[in-house]
Structures are given as structure tokens and as C-alpha cells.
């Protein structure tokens, strides 16, 4: 079939965007989140599983500072530092203590305030202002850094090693942290 190109412009001047396997989310300058694309797992966060060809507002009035997308889930940090996730949760990647998929933003449980958040295919990690990394979700390859590869985590766990990071990056099944000295730990 024919492909459709969606151009998200006014009233959606985005300050940042993130893409998962088949969905994209953007944040406006005032922190409003909009998502579009495939929504079979609720990754758009609009309370449905209907796919959308145009951006739809999500969050019920929540304002976000940053947003990230995994394969079939989305996570964001609210302007007050709280982590929210939605979409597929088969491996605990939403961090709410369950494996229940969520159609709207749901608070990550047991997490400190984060300044940034990143998502791999089926796992998520957050970084605190002090540089501590926390991860949750799929751990088949040890991507959570908790010393227990193969054990999924339904809530955030601190990455081992007592290292302080300035940024985190995720791939499908791995996570890396960058220290202030420029050393990468994966």
C-alpha cells in the first residue's frame, strides 16, 4: 500500500521527540506530550489501543521535561522529576511493580526523582541528579546492571558499582553510562 508521511507542525511545535519500533512521541516547549503511530500495546498513552496517524495529546494535564520510547512502551519524566511509563509491560519495563500493560501514563514505583530517562527494547533506566542510575524491566542480557542477568525487575533497581554518571544510553538489550571523566561503562 501507499505510505503516508505525517508532518507534525502547528499546533505542535515540538522541542523534542522520541521513537519506538512503530510509534513516535513529541514534547512541546510547555511539556505537553503528543504521540502517534501504532498503538497495539497502548504505547501512545491515550487510553486506547487504536493506532493514530496524527499526534494525540496524552497525560491528562501532566507536563513532562523529557520523553523516551522503547519498542512498545513510552516513558517520560514529569517537570517535578517523577517517572511515568505506559504501553507494553510484559517484562516490567513500566516499573510499576506489575507485568500489566497500561494505556495511560502510570507512575514508576519505588523510584527516586530522575533528571533523565532512556528506554531499550523492553527495559528502562533513569538517572538522578546525583548521577545514580536505576533500571527496570527485561534483564535477559544483564542490561539492568544489577548483577542478576536473566532476572527481570518489575520496579527500579540501582545499577551496581557506585559510579556516578552524567548520561545514559540504551540499545535494544544493553545499557551504557558515561562518567564526567568521559569513561563509558556498559
Specify the residue positions occupied by each region the protein language model found.
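An edge-strand/N-cap motif at the start of beta-rich repeat modules
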Residues: 8-40, 49
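Short glycine/serine- and acidic-residue-enriched loop/turn motifs that recur at repeat junctions
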Residues: 34-54, 84-104, 136-155, 178
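C-terminal edge beta-strand
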Residues: 1-7
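Short coil/turn segments at the loop-to-beta-strand junctions that recur within blades
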Residues: 12, 50, 61-64, 100, ...
